[in-house]
Amino acid sequence: MKNIIATVILCLAQCLPQSAQAQQKASPQRTIILMIDGFGEDYYRASAMPHLNQLEKAGIYQVVPSLMPAVTNVNNVAIATGELPDKNGITGNVYLNPATEKEEYIEDPALLLAPTIFERAKKQGIKTALFSCKKKTIDLMGGAADIKLCPECAGAADSPWAKQFGAPPDVYSKEVSYWIFNAALATLKSNPEVGLVYIHTTDYPMHTWAPEEAESKDFLHHLDNYIGKLQQAAPDAAILITADHGLNHKSLCWDLEKACLSRNTPIKIAISPEKDRYFKHHRGMGGSSYVYLKNQADLAKVSQSLRALQGVEAVLTKAEAVKRYHLLPERIGDLLVLGDKRTVFGNLEIAESEELGEHYRSHGSLYEAHVPLFVYNAKQAPAAAYFKYNYLLAAWLYQ
Protein backbone atom coordinates (compact mmCIF):
# COMPACT_ATOMS: atom_id res chain seq x y z
CA MET A 1 0.00 0.00 0.00
CA LYS A 2 2.82 2.37 0.93
CA ASN A 3 4.48 1.60 -2.40
CA ILE A 4 1.26 2.43 -4.28
CA ILE A 5 0.87 5.76 -2.44
CA ALA A 6 4.51 6.62 -3.10
CA THR A 7 4.05 5.82 -6.79
CA VAL A 8 0.93 8.04 -6.99
CA ILE A 9 2.72 10.93 -5.25
CA LEU A 10 5.72 10.55 -7.59
CA CYS A 11 3.41 10.50 -10.62
CA LEU A 12 1.63 13.65 -9.45
CA ALA A 13 4.95 15.39 -8.85
CA GLN A 14 6.10 14.53 -12.36
CA CYS A 15 2.82 15.00 -14.21
CA LEU A 16 1.55 18.25 -12.71
CA PRO A 17 4.41 20.44 -13.97
CA GLN A 18 4.04 18.87 -17.42
CA SER A 19 0.31 19.57 -17.32
CA ALA A 20 0.98 23.15 -16.27
CA GLN A 21 3.50 23.55 -19.09
CA ALA A 22 1.02 22.13 -21.60
CA GLN A 23 -1.65 24.53 -20.37
CA GLN A 24 0.78 27.45 -20.61
CA LYS A 25 1.67 26.48 -24.17
CA ALA A 26 -1.98 26.10 -25.15
CA SER A 27 -3.01 29.38 -23.54
CA PRO A 28 -0.16 31.90 -23.79
CA GLN A 29 -0.51 35.44 -22.54
CA ARG A 30 -2.79 37.70 -24.56
CA THR A 31 -0.75 40.20 -26.56
CA ILE A 32 -1.50 43.62 -28.02
CA ILE A 33 0.90 44.94 -30.65
CA LEU A 34 0.59 48.62 -31.49
CA MET A 35 2.46 49.99 -34.49
CA ILE A 36 2.11 53.79 -34.31
CA ASP A 37 2.86 54.90 -37.85
CA GLY A 38 5.30 57.83 -38.00
CA PHE A 39 5.85 57.98 -34.23
CA GLY A 40 9.36 59.36 -33.78
CA GLU A 41 10.61 60.08 -30.27
CA ASP A 42 10.29 63.83 -30.89
CA TYR A 43 6.52 63.34 -31.19
CA TYR A 44 6.44 61.29 -28.01
CA ARG A 45 8.38 63.83 -25.96
CA ALA A 46 6.39 66.81 -27.27
CA SER A 47 2.99 65.40 -26.27
CA ALA A 48 1.18 64.69 -23.01
CA MET A 49 1.02 60.88 -22.95
CA PRO A 50 0.75 59.81 -19.28
CA HIS A 51 -0.32 56.24 -20.01
CA LEU A 52 2.63 55.71 -22.32
CA ASN A 53 4.90 57.34 -19.74
CA GLN A 54 3.68 54.76 -17.24
CA LEU A 55 4.46 51.92 -19.67
CA GLU A 56 7.92 53.38 -20.19
CA LYS A 57 8.64 53.42 -16.45
CA ALA A 58 7.14 50.02 -15.66
CA GLY A 59 8.50 48.05 -18.62
CA ILE A 60 11.24 48.09 -21.23
CA TYR A 61 11.76 51.33 -23.12
CA GLN A 62 14.44 52.35 -25.56
CA VAL A 63 14.93 54.24 -28.80
CA VAL A 64 16.02 51.77 -31.47
CA PRO A 65 16.93 51.84 -35.16
CA SER A 66 14.17 51.09 -37.63
CA LEU A 67 14.94 49.55 -41.00
CA MET A 68 15.92 51.21 -44.24
CA PRO A 69 14.39 52.55 -46.33
CA ALA A 70 12.45 54.17 -43.48
CA VAL A 71 8.99 53.53 -44.94
CA THR A 72 5.90 51.68 -43.71
CA ASN A 73 5.94 48.41 -45.65
CA VAL A 74 9.60 47.71 -44.91
CA ASN A 75 9.17 48.13 -41.17
CA ASN A 76 5.59 46.96 -40.65
CA VAL A 77 6.25 43.67 -42.44
CA ALA A 78 9.56 43.22 -40.61
CA ILE A 79 7.75 43.71 -37.28
CA ALA A 80 5.00 41.29 -38.33
CA THR A 81 7.45 38.61 -39.50
CA GLY A 82 10.35 39.22 -37.14
CA GLU A 83 12.63 39.04 -40.18
CA LEU A 84 14.82 41.51 -42.08
CA PRO A 85 13.94 42.52 -45.68
CA ASP A 86 16.43 40.07 -47.20
CA LYS A 87 14.39 37.28 -45.59
CA ASN A 88 10.83 38.66 -45.78
CA GLY A 89 11.22 40.12 -49.29
CA ILE A 90 9.75 43.57 -48.68
CA THR A 91 12.05 46.44 -49.68
CA GLY A 92 9.62 49.34 -50.05
CA ASN A 93 6.05 50.40 -50.66
CA VAL A 94 6.66 49.94 -54.39
CA TYR A 95 9.06 47.99 -56.60
CA LEU A 96 10.05 47.42 -60.22
CA ASN A 97 8.36 44.21 -61.31
CA PRO A 98 10.98 42.36 -63.41
CA ALA A 99 8.27 40.50 -65.33
CA THR A 100 6.54 43.67 -66.53
CA GLU A 101 9.38 46.20 -66.16
CA LYS A 102 6.80 48.45 -64.52
CA GLU A 103 6.59 50.12 -61.13
CA GLU A 104 4.03 48.33 -58.94
CA TYR A 105 2.75 48.80 -55.40
CA ILE A 106 3.81 46.11 -52.93
CA GLU A 107 0.41 44.84 -51.84
CA ASP A 108 0.33 41.27 -53.15
CA PRO A 109 0.91 38.76 -50.30
CA ALA A 110 2.70 36.52 -52.82
CA LEU A 111 5.63 38.94 -52.51
CA LEU A 112 5.98 38.06 -48.82
CA LEU A 113 8.72 35.46 -48.30
CA ALA A 114 8.44 34.83 -44.55
CA PRO A 115 5.54 33.74 -42.32
CA THR A 116 3.77 36.46 -40.35
CA ILE A 117 3.06 36.47 -36.63
CA PHE A 118 -0.55 35.66 -37.53
CA GLU A 119 0.58 32.46 -39.24
CA ARG A 120 2.82 31.54 -36.32
CA ALA A 121 -0.05 32.11 -33.87
CA LYS A 122 -2.48 30.08 -35.99
CA LYS A 123 -0.12 27.08 -35.86
CA GLN A 124 -0.40 27.23 -32.07
CA GLY A 125 -4.19 27.49 -32.19
CA ILE A 126 -4.28 31.17 -31.22
CA LYS A 127 -6.94 33.46 -32.69
CA THR A 128 -5.71 36.79 -34.02
CA ALA A 129 -7.02 40.17 -35.16
CA LEU A 130 -5.48 42.86 -37.36
CA PHE A 131 -6.83 46.42 -37.34
CA SER A 132 -5.17 48.88 -39.72
CA CYS A 133 -5.88 52.33 -41.09
CA LYS A 134 -4.24 51.26 -44.36
CA LYS A 135 -5.68 48.64 -46.70
CA LYS A 136 -2.23 47.70 -47.99
CA THR A 137 -1.39 46.35 -44.52
CA ILE A 138 -4.43 44.07 -44.54
CA ASP A 139 -3.74 42.92 -48.11
CA LEU A 140 -0.02 42.31 -47.63
CA MET A 141 0.24 40.70 -44.21
CA GLY A 142 -3.27 39.97 -42.93
CA GLY A 143 -4.08 36.77 -44.78
CA ALA A 144 -3.85 34.52 -41.73
CA ALA A 145 -5.57 36.90 -39.29
CA ASP A 146 -8.94 35.59 -38.08
CA ILE A 147 -10.39 39.09 -37.74
CA LYS A 148 -9.29 41.99 -39.94
CA LEU A 149 -10.54 45.49 -40.51
CA CYS A 150 -9.54 48.65 -42.33
CA PRO A 151 -11.70 51.64 -43.32
CA GLU A 152 -11.26 50.88 -47.03
CA CYS A 153 -11.76 47.12 -46.72
CA ALA A 154 -14.77 45.53 -48.38
CA GLY A 155 -17.64 45.35 -45.93
CA ALA A 156 -16.17 47.82 -43.44
CA ALA A 157 -19.07 50.26 -43.86
CA ASP A 158 -21.57 47.48 -43.08
CA SER A 159 -19.55 45.82 -40.33
CA PRO A 160 -20.70 45.51 -36.70
CA TRP A 161 -18.04 48.09 -35.84
CA ALA A 162 -19.56 50.60 -38.26
CA LYS A 163 -22.95 50.06 -36.67
CA GLN A 164 -21.43 50.64 -33.25
CA PHE A 165 -18.98 53.47 -34.00
CA GLY A 166 -20.32 55.00 -37.21
CA ALA A 167 -19.11 54.86 -40.79
CA PRO A 168 -15.34 54.61 -41.32
CA PRO A 169 -13.79 58.11 -41.32
CA ASP A 170 -11.75 59.43 -44.21
CA VAL A 171 -8.26 57.89 -44.39
CA TYR A 172 -6.84 61.42 -44.44
CA SER A 173 -7.92 62.25 -40.90
CA LYS A 174 -7.01 61.84 -37.25
CA GLU A 175 -10.35 60.18 -36.60
CA VAL A 176 -9.60 57.11 -38.69
CA SER A 177 -7.09 55.96 -36.05
CA TYR A 178 -9.67 56.46 -33.31
CA TRP A 179 -12.17 54.35 -35.25
CA ILE A 180 -9.64 51.53 -35.57
CA PHE A 181 -8.87 51.73 -31.85
CA ASN A 182 -12.57 51.56 -30.96
CA ALA A 183 -12.96 48.43 -33.07
CA ALA A 184 -9.91 46.83 -31.44
CA LEU A 185 -11.18 47.69 -27.95
CA ALA A 186 -14.61 46.24 -28.71
CA THR A 187 -12.96 43.04 -29.92
CA LEU A 188 -10.82 42.73 -26.79
CA LYS A 189 -13.92 43.09 -24.62
CA SER A 190 -16.29 40.85 -26.56
CA ASN A 191 -13.83 38.23 -27.87
CA PRO A 192 -11.56 37.20 -24.98
CA GLU A 193 -10.52 34.14 -26.98
CA VAL A 194 -8.55 36.39 -29.36
CA GLY A 195 -4.98 35.99 -28.17
CA LEU A 196 -3.26 38.53 -30.42
CA VAL A 197 -4.48 41.97 -31.47
CA TYR A 198 -2.31 43.98 -33.89
CA ILE A 199 -3.20 47.68 -34.33
CA HIS A 200 -1.70 49.90 -37.05
CA THR A 201 -2.53 53.62 -37.01
CA THR A 202 -1.99 56.26 -39.71
CA ASP A 203 0.84 58.77 -40.00
CA TYR A 204 -1.37 61.33 -41.73
CA PRO A 205 -1.23 63.62 -38.64
CA MET A 206 2.58 63.42 -38.57
CA HIS A 207 2.78 64.22 -42.28
CA THR A 208 0.52 67.20 -41.61
CA TRP A 209 1.74 68.63 -38.29
CA ALA A 210 5.10 68.97 -36.56
CA PRO A 211 5.55 67.56 -33.03
CA GLU A 212 5.07 70.93 -31.34
CA GLU A 213 1.83 71.82 -33.16
CA ALA A 214 -1.45 71.66 -31.24
CA GLU A 215 -3.15 69.27 -33.70
CA SER A 216 -0.29 66.80 -33.38
CA LYS A 217 -0.38 66.96 -29.59
CA ASP A 218 -4.15 66.49 -29.62
CA PHE A 219 -3.89 63.41 -31.84
CA LEU A 220 -1.25 61.75 -29.67
CA HIS A 221 -3.09 62.63 -26.47
CA HIS A 222 -6.11 60.81 -27.91
CA LEU A 223 -3.93 57.81 -28.79
CA ASP A 224 -2.57 57.80 -25.26
CA ASN A 225 -6.11 57.68 -23.87
CA TYR A 226 -6.76 54.65 -26.05
CA ILE A 227 -3.62 52.99 -24.71
CA GLY A 228 -5.07 53.49 -21.23
CA LYS A 229 -8.33 51.91 -22.40
CA LEU A 230 -6.41 48.94 -23.80
CA GLN A 231 -4.88 48.38 -20.37
CA GLN A 232 -8.31 48.53 -18.76
CA ALA A 233 -9.90 46.20 -21.31
CA ALA A 234 -7.11 43.61 -21.08
CA PRO A 235 -5.15 44.07 -17.83
CA ASP A 236 -3.64 40.61 -18.30
CA ALA A 237 -2.23 41.39 -21.75
CA ALA A 238 1.31 42.10 -22.81
CA ILE A 239 1.50 45.44 -24.65
CA LEU A 240 4.21 45.84 -27.29
CA ILE A 241 4.57 49.21 -29.02
CA THR A 242 6.89 50.64 -31.64
CA ALA A 243 6.86 52.64 -34.89
CA ASP A 244 8.00 52.20 -38.47
CA HIS A 245 9.71 55.58 -38.88
CA GLY A 246 9.72 59.18 -37.74
CA LEU A 247 9.07 62.29 -39.84
CA ASN A 248 10.88 65.51 -40.69
CA HIS A 249 10.25 68.68 -42.64
CA LYS A 250 11.75 68.42 -46.13
CA SER A 251 12.63 71.49 -48.17
CA LEU A 252 13.98 70.09 -51.47
CA CYS A 253 12.91 67.38 -53.90
CA TRP A 254 14.91 65.98 -56.82
CA ASP A 255 13.44 64.13 -59.78
CA LEU A 256 16.46 61.89 -60.34
CA GLU A 257 15.39 60.77 -63.81
CA LYS A 258 15.25 64.36 -65.01
CA ALA A 259 18.41 65.35 -63.12
CA CYS A 260 20.45 62.51 -64.60
CA LEU A 261 19.09 63.13 -68.10
CA SER A 262 20.06 66.81 -68.01
CA ARG A 263 23.61 65.79 -66.97
CA ASN A 264 23.96 63.39 -69.92
CA THR A 265 23.86 60.32 -67.69
CA PRO A 266 20.34 58.97 -68.37
CA ILE A 267 18.93 56.15 -66.25
CA LYS A 268 16.17 53.59 -66.79
CA ILE A 269 14.04 54.65 -63.81
CA ALA A 270 14.24 56.03 -60.27
CA ILE A 271 11.77 54.63 -57.75
CA SER A 272 10.91 56.20 -54.41
CA PRO A 273 10.35 53.32 -51.93
CA GLU A 274 7.97 55.64 -50.06
CA LYS A 275 5.48 55.92 -52.92
CA ASP A 276 2.11 54.34 -52.18
CA ARG A 277 -1.58 55.02 -52.80
CA TYR A 278 -1.71 57.62 -50.01
CA PHE A 279 -0.44 60.37 -52.29
CA LYS A 280 -1.78 63.16 -50.10
CA HIS A 281 0.60 62.10 -47.33
CA HIS A 282 3.85 62.68 -49.20
CA ARG A 283 3.23 63.13 -52.96
CA GLY A 284 5.19 59.91 -53.46
CA MET A 285 8.43 61.59 -52.39
CA GLY A 286 10.83 60.16 -49.81
CA GLY A 287 14.35 60.40 -48.48
CA SER A 288 15.71 57.44 -50.45
CA SER A 289 15.53 56.25 -54.04
CA TYR A 290 16.28 53.09 -55.98
CA VAL A 291 18.00 53.96 -59.26
CA TYR A 292 17.97 51.45 -62.13
CA LEU A 293 20.63 51.86 -64.83
CA LYS A 294 20.18 51.54 -68.57
CA ASN A 295 23.55 49.80 -68.72
CA GLN A 296 25.87 48.57 -65.97
CA ALA A 297 28.70 50.41 -67.70
CA ASP A 298 26.99 53.68 -66.69
CA LEU A 299 27.39 53.03 -62.96
CA ALA A 300 30.39 55.28 -62.30
CA LYS A 301 29.09 58.20 -64.39
CA VAL A 302 25.58 58.06 -62.95
CA SER A 303 26.95 57.79 -59.42
CA GLN A 304 29.06 60.88 -60.02
CA SER A 305 26.07 62.85 -61.29
CA LEU A 306 23.98 61.82 -58.28
CA ARG A 307 26.66 62.62 -55.70
CA ALA A 308 26.99 66.12 -57.13
CA LEU A 309 23.33 66.96 -56.41
CA GLN A 310 22.62 69.21 -53.45
CA GLY A 311 21.18 67.20 -50.57
CA VAL A 312 22.41 63.79 -51.73
CA GLU A 313 24.24 62.30 -48.77
CA ALA A 314 25.19 58.87 -50.09
CA VAL A 315 25.04 56.75 -53.24
CA LEU A 316 25.41 53.02 -52.57
CA THR A 317 25.82 50.21 -55.07
CA LYS A 318 23.36 47.33 -54.93
CA ALA A 319 25.96 45.17 -53.15
CA GLU A 320 26.67 47.89 -50.59
CA ALA A 321 22.96 48.49 -49.94
CA VAL A 322 22.27 44.75 -49.53
CA LYS A 323 25.13 44.35 -47.05
CA ARG A 324 24.42 47.50 -45.03
CA TYR A 325 20.61 47.34 -44.85
CA HIS A 326 19.88 43.61 -45.35
CA LEU A 327 17.85 44.20 -48.51
CA LEU A 328 16.74 41.58 -51.04
CA PRO A 329 18.88 42.28 -54.14
CA GLU A 330 16.19 41.20 -56.60
CA ARG A 331 13.85 43.95 -55.40
CA ILE A 332 16.10 47.01 -55.29
CA GLY A 333 17.83 49.15 -57.89
CA ASP A 334 21.41 49.16 -59.09
CA LEU A 335 21.98 52.12 -56.78
CA LEU A 336 20.44 53.31 -53.52
CA VAL A 337 20.46 57.10 -53.15
CA LEU A 338 20.07 58.59 -49.66
CA GLY A 339 19.11 62.18 -48.94
CA ASP A 340 20.15 64.43 -46.11
CA LYS A 341 17.66 65.50 -43.46
CA ARG A 342 15.89 68.01 -45.73
CA THR A 343 15.98 66.27 -49.14
CA VAL A 344 13.57 63.85 -50.81
CA PHE A 345 13.29 62.20 -54.22
CA GLY A 346 10.26 61.63 -56.43
CA ASN A 347 8.58 62.33 -59.75
CA LEU A 348 8.07 66.01 -60.63
CA GLU A 349 5.88 67.18 -63.50
CA ILE A 350 8.12 69.87 -64.96
CA ALA A 351 11.43 70.77 -63.31
CA GLU A 352 14.22 68.49 -62.12
CA SER A 353 13.98 69.94 -58.61
CA GLU A 354 11.44 71.72 -56.44
CA GLU A 355 11.62 73.75 -53.26
CA LEU A 356 8.98 72.40 -50.90
CA GLY A 357 6.66 74.39 -48.65
CA GLU A 358 7.29 74.91 -44.97
CA HIS A 359 4.60 72.38 -44.01
CA TYR A 360 5.80 69.50 -46.18
CA ARG A 361 6.84 66.52 -44.03
CA SER A 362 8.10 63.12 -45.11
CA HIS A 363 10.43 60.22 -44.29
CA GLY A 364 12.47 57.47 -45.93
CA SER A 365 15.97 58.58 -44.94
CA LEU A 366 18.32 57.65 -42.11
CA TYR A 367 17.10 60.75 -40.27
CA GLU A 368 13.72 59.10 -39.71
CA ALA A 369 15.14 55.66 -38.87
CA HIS A 370 15.07 55.76 -35.05
CA VAL A 371 11.87 55.07 -33.12
CA PRO A 372 10.62 54.37 -29.59
CA LEU A 373 10.03 50.79 -28.46
CA PHE A 374 7.96 49.74 -25.42
CA VAL A 375 7.50 46.28 -23.91
CA TYR A 376 5.05 46.19 -21.01
CA ASN A 377 3.72 43.34 -18.86
CA ALA A 378 5.18 40.71 -21.19
CA LYS A 379 5.84 37.74 -18.92
CA GLN A 380 7.96 35.77 -21.39
CA ALA A 381 9.77 38.68 -23.06
CA PRO A 382 13.54 38.59 -23.52
CA ALA A 383 15.77 41.02 -21.63
CA ALA A 384 16.00 44.63 -22.80
CA ALA A 385 19.30 43.96 -24.58
CA TYR A 386 17.45 41.73 -27.07
CA PHE A 387 15.46 44.61 -28.55
CA LYS A 388 18.18 46.15 -30.72
CA TYR A 389 15.82 47.04 -33.61
CA ASN A 390 12.12 47.74 -33.98
CA TYR A 391 11.55 44.57 -36.02
CA LEU A 392 12.47 42.45 -32.98
CA LEU A 393 9.47 43.77 -31.03
CA ALA A 394 7.49 40.53 -31.39
CA ALA A 395 9.98 38.26 -33.17
CA TRP A 396 10.22 36.08 -30.05
CA LEU A 397 6.49 35.32 -29.92
CA TYR A 398 4.98 31.95 -30.99
CA GLN A 399 8.31 30.43 -31.98
Protein language model features and the residues they cover:
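Positively charged n-region of N-terminal signal peptides that target proteins for export
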Residues: 1-4
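Bacterial N-terminal signal peptides
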Residues: 6-15
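Boundary at the C-terminal end of the N-terminal hydrophobic targeting segment
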Residues: 20-22
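Catalytic metal-binding/acid-base residues of hydrolase active sites
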Residues: 39-40, 202, 209, 245-247
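Short, structured active-site-proximal loop/turn typified by the sulfatase FGly-forming signature C/S-X-P-X-R
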Residues: 44-87
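His/Asp/Glu-rich, glycine-adjacent segments
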Residues: 84-210, 298-301, 307-311, 394-398
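Active-site neighborhoods of enzymes that stabilize oxyanions during catalysis
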Residues: 275-399
